[in-house]
Amino acid sequence: MTPARRMPPVIGRNGVAYESPSAQLPLTQADMLDSHHLQQALQQQYFDQIPVTTTAAADSGDNMLHGRADAGGLVDEFESKSCSENVDGAGDGLSGDDQDPNQRPRKKRYHRHTQHQIQEMEAFFKECPHPDDKQRKELSRELGLEPLQVKFWFQNKRTQMKNQHERHENAQLRAENDKLRAENMRYKEALSSASCPNCGGPAALGEMSFDEHHLRVENARLRDEIDRISGIAAKHVGKPPIVSFPVLSSPLAVAAARSPLDLAGAYGVVTPGLDMFGGAGDLLRGVHPLDADKPMIVELAVAAMDELVQMAQLDEPLWSSSSEPAAALLDEEEYARMFPRGLGPKQYGLKSEASRHGAVVIMTHSNLVEILMDVNQFATVFSSIVSRASTHEVLSTGVAGNYNGALQVMSMEFQVPSPLVPTRESYFVRYCKNNSDGTWAVVDVSLDSLRPSPVQKCRRRPSGCLIQEMPNGYSKVTWVEHVEVDDSSVHNIYKPLVNSGLAFGAKRWVGTLDRQCERLASAMASNIPNGDLGVITSVEGRKSMLKLAERMVASFCGGVTASVAHQWTTLSGSGAEDVRVMTRKSVDDPGRPPGIVLNAATSFWLPVPPAAVFDFLRDETSRSEWDILSNGGAVQEMAHIANGRDHGNSVSLLRVNSANSNQSNMLILQESCTDASGSYVVYAPVDIVAMNVVLNGGDPDYVALLPSGFAILPDGPSGNAQAAVGENGSGSGGGSLLTVAFQILVDSVPTAKLSLGSVATVNSLIACTVERIKAAVCRDSNPQ
């Protein structure tokens, strides 16, 4: 008998040598010659060392190598298992071929990877979840594993992560569905208990009001948006889990819950006087941040402050020079390299807008900081840019009796004076700091993870201003505006303006601040010369009249934009020149006449520079050329207040010398203002008795106003925007974008129904005014 040759050991997992059990047994000459059995034995010994993957993702490969995998070998979340296996009792004297085929399979034991191997593969998985053959072989050599063991571990890990994400997203979608069902039940209950505001009886569903119809349309739109986002999320498996937040109530749900619960008082102080055509939007009813989130908010605000200071002070290569003076363009690649922290990469579907602008303004740094940190003052000073604002929570009031270290969670809605440009809502934290070099900085940064909204269309990266004290009560302000927005809804005629940064950029913020600082200085001036006819010299009279004009301009700006709180209805026109109208009821408001007010607005392009349009509209001698309500009568300026260096910045009191005796007691209050970003001419009829009270220093809040007017913007950056708008009211440039808006009291009874005749009359009024303005300004710009 020939002695059996000892087989070499097979190297298994973890470097352990496994000897063949049959190597200890004597073989006959026939067995030695049976190469087929010998080959099967060697193959069985080799494949016994290979791990078996048990996940669904690797069933096919597993079946080829091992037959059916054991179901108990699934890898748990915390520890990966190698399914390398040895048959128990391998040394019982029977080879694989000699075992009884009817005998029940032996219980298999599993060998776990070491903690070091798991940690190394986990770290590699974070960097590369799909290693190639070369990477797997390298990893197997480093960890003492077979390449197939590494391959199957990564297969198991990928399947595990996929299952986790699918479970999380399914739970999230189920929660959204439950909320929608509960919301639908609230709607049904609210409709079933609805009562008539006039008689108190049950309201007939067939008599749905105009506002209720729009609320239903808005609710349907929100449902479609949630379905669309859910569909997109279901396709992107493998992304990090999205933190689930409660969906904000729709306007109808808010209206239904307003009676038993004061939501406005529960969610923050909404700035009074800004919400003039409807309730606050969902964003401005944002929730308070949780206590657990406040450390993250503080950390984000500190990082944003560091970023803002650097962006305000650094030049090239971060900022490249621009054709406009004191303006700069941001290098996106350099920005991403310098500031890897913060909000992270740009979100899909959003476009970056970044700008920087500086100016010296006539105001102390302490007063500027107070305006920026007081939401009421901020909304008043920037009423042409901010349509609505609220502070949800004050996390810190500052130290040492000032705003150093103040931290506030806020939300705002930013606007352009036209119904063709949607407003931008933002939910952010505002942080104020006194830097070591003596400068003050105020920064805003969006709270993306806390924003309770399924759709985000505006994200504020670190934006704000750096304030440096100057002699004689002046301050140098450097403003940085950096946002990511979805501007797909902007009308085509306004896209060049928006893309240039003149609509929402830093230049508009600084220009508005500079003009308002001059206005405040004018209101406080006491050395007014008495030589000019009609100039109001009384300090109290000037303050009261300027305050009344300020409210008039804020009311005009807040009522002409495409805010989420406004529901515009398109009447007629073609394209951009459609006339849009909306109604509101004025009740118990001393600043507005009671009744139903109809607001109509339209925007159009003029081939005339903005400065020429501004001079034509503010000049009282040319008013009869476009003002139909003056009945062709001559207009005379009765009083005048200059409130800036530019002679176009003024408040005037006008008298219309009309043949109609019914208008003998009516005056017109008008404010005209212009800066480097745009111009306004706003006016309102006022009672002569009420104006006498104001001129004597009386309270202007009780003067009823229905402002109308014009907003004049450049049509883009072409032709040098500064020359196009004119810092001194003159200059030449490209065309103009003109918005015309009227407010008309159509019925003095707030509960009356709006008639189609009133709408048709206002539509004809605004259309006729537009045609007159086009004819007049085009004739003046092209004299024969």
UniProtKB/Swiss-Prot annotation:
GO terms for molecular function: DNA binding; DNA-binding transcription factor activity, RNA polymerase II-specific; lipid binding. Residues 290-522 form the START domain. Residues 155-196 form a coiled coil. InterPro entries: GLABRA2/ANL2/PDF2/ATML1-like, HD, Homeobox_CS, Homeodomain-like_sf, START-like_dom_sf, START_lipid-bd_dom. Gene3D superfamilies: 3.30.530.20, Homeodomain-like (1.10.10.60). GO terms for cellular component: nucleus. Probable transcription factor that may be involved in protoderm differentiation and radial pattern formation during early embryogenesis. This is Homeobox-leucine zipper protein ROC1. The lineage of its organism: Eukaryota, Viridiplantae, Streptophyta, Embryophyta, Tracheophyta. The gene is ROC1.
